[in-house]
């Protein structure tokens, strides 16, 4: 069975956490695809470029290269992983055909790493996407802004999309976007959202347990 893991870029802001994830991924059975976010490096570089008047496309490129840098770091800790970071879905599939573990970052401007993870999950025929996020579950509203936000243990993609589209959640509190949801929904790929600070939750979700929120068709 193929596993697809989306790692929040915030994971890479904690050195020990990166090592723990490497250990968990190394010990997973079967084939594993990992998509990394850009994290603080991406946010900082994008902010500087934006201040300097760079185009949105150029800002996106900075985010992409930051995510690929995180991917390369993880690859360096996974001795049996494909040694390069695929730059598009074609390169990913070529790497996937001959390696047990493939790690990638962003693919192209205008496309989030959440969408990349959804595309990868679709391409490899994964039944689930494991989203190690910067929040411990999906909430009815952004819990950092609304203390009355309800934690949602199980929900459908239609409900999730409404939450992401909500005007009170700019960016969907960095969880996913409507494009990634569309891809996952059309393939009926289950998504598990859980606290990215807990690498052990990857193991739990890989077993079909729900350590945070479970999103289904």
Curated annotation (Swiss-Prot):
Activity regulation comment: Inhibited by UTP.
Enzyme class label: transferase
InterPro entries from the UniProt entry: AceGlu_kinase-like_sf, Asp/Glu/Uridylate_kinase, Uridylate_kinase, Uridylate_kinase_arch/spir
Binding site for UMP: 38, 60, 107-113
Major location (coarse): cytoplasm
Biological or metabolic pathway of the protein: Pyrimidine metabolism; CTP biosynthesis via de novo pathway; UDP from UMP (UMPK route): step 1/1
Keywords on record: ATP-binding, Cytoplasm, Kinase, Nucleotide-binding, Pyrimidine biosynthesis, Transferase
GO BP term (any one): 'de novo' CTP biosynthetic process
Molecular-function GO terms, alphabetical: ATP binding; UMP kinase activity
Pfam annotation, one family: AA_kinase
Top-rank taxon: Archaea
UniProt-listed CDD domains: AAK_UMPK-PyrH-Pf
Record bears the keyword Oxidoreductase: no
Catalysed transformations (reactions): UMP + ATP = UDP + ADP
Location of the protein in the cell: Cytoplasm
Coiled coil spans: none
EC number: 2.7.4.22
Record flagged with keyword Lipid metabolism: no
NCBIfam families assigned to the protein according to its UniProt record, in alphabetical order: pyrH_arch
Self-association state and partner proteins as the record states: Homohexamer.
Purpose of the protein: Catalyzes the reversible phosphorylation of UMP to UDP.
Protein name: Uridylate kinase
Source organism of the structure: Pyrobaculum aerophilum (strain ATCC 51768 / DSM 7523 / JCM 9630 / CIP 104966 / NBRC 100827 / IM2)
Name of the encoding gene: pyrH
């Amino acid at each position: 069975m193929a596993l697809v893991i989306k790692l929040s870029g915030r994971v890479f802001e904690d050195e020990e956490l990166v090592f723990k994830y490497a250990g968990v991924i190394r010990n997973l059975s079967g084939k594993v695809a990992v998509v990394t976010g850009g994290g603080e490096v991406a946010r900082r570089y994008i902010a500087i470029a934006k201040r300097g008047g760079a185009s949105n496309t150029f800002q996106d490129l900075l985010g992409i290269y930051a995510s690929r840098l995180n991917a390369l770091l993880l690859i360096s800790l996974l001795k049996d992983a494909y040694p390069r970071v695929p730059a598009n879905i074609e390169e990913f599939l070529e790497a996937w055909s001959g390696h047990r573990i493939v790690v990638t970052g962003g693919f192209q401007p205008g496309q989030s790493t959440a969408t990349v993870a959804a595309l990868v999950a679709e391409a490899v025929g994964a039944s689930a996407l494991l989203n190690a996020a910067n929040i411990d579950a999906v909430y009815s509203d952004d819990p950092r802004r609304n203390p009355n936000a309800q934690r949602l243990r199980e929900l459908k993609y239609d409900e999730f999309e409404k939450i992401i589209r909500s005007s009170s959640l700019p960016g969907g509190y960095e969880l996913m976007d409507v494009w990634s949801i569309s891809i996952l929904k059309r393939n009926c790929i289950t998504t598990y959202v859980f606290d990215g600070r807990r690498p052990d939750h990857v193991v739990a979700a890989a077993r079909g347990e729900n350590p945070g929120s479970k999103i289904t068709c």
